[in-house]
């Protein structure tokens, strides 16, 4: 079968013919229909410092997909051949302290599909443990099913705190930030302001329901947005950028007693004015992955309730044209990029 392999510890990714994956005990073999390129895939493609520290080539990349079950291994009880599925990309042990207290998303022994320890879905076929396979409601289209993984990150972050009637500041208009804007509006936020320096991505944020967008590259400021909306601060902050300046700008413009959900990965040497955090009684909550399985139930219900993710999907390429997909990701002038196997 064809697969995209991170063959060497170097810039790039390579298409190769590889053997079909073996179907082991409790495994489900899935024929991939569509896969999506993630920001993490871009890190591995570039072979940056994070990838060098966490990933060990060779391996098949990819962890966002939708497909059809074509074979089940011994022990599989609840998944049937022919079912349309996606998967939770974090394979957890189920036995560590965190798993046993209902916090599998921070399992001490996590294996990440297509990243660390398990070949991924940038291939014609992929095996996933039954415990991680997610059956899909027929009303959820393939395009949305293929991006449930990052939609889950956005959902986990956006719903970390109550939103109904609240003013929300989102720093970072990447895929997760723009989806979070839609979630916030769906959940009843009063105003949603999104900041970034990429006008194309801010346009996507507007399509997803942002009340106002702030482009720092044009000299626009959060203060300008607050003045225009007639507000003096924000109740909820969703930090998606990982940019120290954006994080500190957020802290400066929160109401006292406000809440911040932090998904963006800040540099280790980030300087923070902790006095503002302490004396303004701010709560900062770190976010990783998706809660298993509450986040998945929330995602499904929002999609069935009419939340439209189509504005975030900007490019589609055939699997053989994967290089075009990675090129547009490198350019930054895109939302979500899909690779279509069929």
PLM features: what roles do these ranges have?
Residues 21-35, 50-97, 137-139:
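Glycine-rich beta-strand-centered segment in the early N-terminal region that forms part
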Residues 138-218, 223:
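Mid-domain Rossmann-like dinucleotide-binding core that forms the NAD(H)/NADP(H) cofactor-binding site
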Residues 258-259:
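Glycine-centered, small-residue-biased loops immediately flanking beta-strands
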Residues 263-264:
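Acidic carboxylate diad motif detector
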Residues 93-171:
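NAD(P)H dinucleotide-binding glycine-rich loop of Rossmann-like/cofactor-binding domains
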Residues 254-255:
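Helix-to-beta-strand junctions that scaffold the AdoMet/dcAdoMet cofactor pocket
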Residues 3-22, 39-71, 86, 107-119:
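N-terminal glycine-rich cofactor-binding segment
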Residues 223-227, 231, 267-315, 323-324, ...:
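C-terminal substrate-binding/catalytic core of Rossmann-like NAD(P)-dependent dehydrogenases/reductases
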């Amino acid at each position: 079968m064809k697969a995209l392999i991170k063959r060497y510890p170097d810039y790039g990714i390579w298409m190769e013919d590889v053997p079909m994956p073996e179907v082991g005990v409790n495994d489900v073999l899935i024929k991939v229909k569509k896969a999506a390129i993630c920001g993490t895939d871009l890190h591995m493609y570039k072979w940056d410092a994070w990838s060098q520290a966490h990933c060990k080539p060779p391996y098949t990349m990819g962890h966002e997909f939708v497909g059809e079950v074509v074979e089940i291994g011994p022990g599989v009880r609840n998944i049937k051949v022919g079912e349309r599925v996606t998967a939770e990309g974090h394979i957890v042990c189920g036995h560590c302290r965190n798993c046993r207290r209902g916090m599998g998303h921070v399992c001490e022994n996590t294996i990440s599909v297509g990243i660390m320890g398990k070949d991924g879905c940038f291939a014609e076929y992929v095996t996933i443990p039954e415990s991680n396979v997610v059956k899909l409601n027929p009303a959820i289209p393939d395009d949305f099913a293929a991006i449930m993984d990052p939609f889950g990150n956005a959902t986990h972050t956006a719903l970390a705190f109550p939103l109904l009637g609240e003013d929300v500041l989102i720093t970072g208009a990447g895929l997760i930030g723009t989806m979070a804007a839609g979630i916030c509006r769906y959940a009843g936020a009063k105003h949603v302001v999104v900041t970034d320096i990429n006008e194309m991505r801010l346009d996507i944020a507007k399509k997803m329901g942002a009340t106002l967008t702030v482009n720092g590259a044009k000299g626009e400021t959060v203060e300008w947005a607050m003045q225009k909306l007639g507000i003096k601060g924000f109740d909820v902050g969703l930090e998606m950028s990982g940019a120290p300046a954006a994080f500190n700008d957020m802290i400066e413009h929160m109401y006292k007693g406000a809440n911040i959900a932090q998904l963006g990965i800040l540099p280790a040497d980030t300087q923070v004015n902790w006095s503002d955090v302490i004396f303004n009684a701010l709560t900062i909550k770190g976010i990783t992955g998706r809660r298993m399985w509450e986040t998945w139930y929330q995602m499904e219900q929002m999609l069935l309730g009419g939340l439209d993710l189509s504005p975030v999907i900007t490019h589609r390429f055939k699997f053989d044209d994967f290089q075009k997909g990675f090129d547009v990701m490198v350019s930054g002038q895109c939302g979500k990029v899909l690779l279509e196997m069929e």
